Amino acid sequence: MGLFNLIWFLIFGLANAIVYLVLSLIFAITIIGIPIAKSMLQFAKLSAFPFGKEVIRETELKGKENVSGFRKTGGIILNTLWFPMGLILSLLHLILGVLAFITILGIPIGVVYVRMSKFLLFPIGAKVVSNKQAIASAVVNEISKRQD
């Protein structure tokens, strides 16, 4: 855990993570909300310690051919249901990001908020992985594209 993650956790991360953990528990009460609850747990992990993490789609991580059609269809339906709430949360995080960009010291915080807004818009099927894992996944996907 780096210094930025520790500072972020103490100032922003703990409160954000608690909010999204509670939101995850609320969605987990309903059966249809369990995938959203899992995504909110992923987001709580990102909001607690965001530096050194990337948000990528499950199809980018596993490859399009390794994700079932049922999972893709379910993700589209649930992301559509989530969209009104996700749009509000995403815009809120974008506004916070823009406000953070105003100061030079706030630029890393602004980058984090923009990354979070990307996740919140369509959370179903998004995964939080380390930067190294995201790069490795991108390399594997590019190699497989070139072989086809």
What are these regions (language model features)?
Residues M1-A44, S68-F101, V112:
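Alpha-helical membrane-anchoring segments
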Residues N141-D148:
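Long, low-complexity, intrinsically disordered cytosolic termini of multi-pass membrane proteins
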Residues S24-E65, L96-N141:
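Membrane-interface alpha-helices
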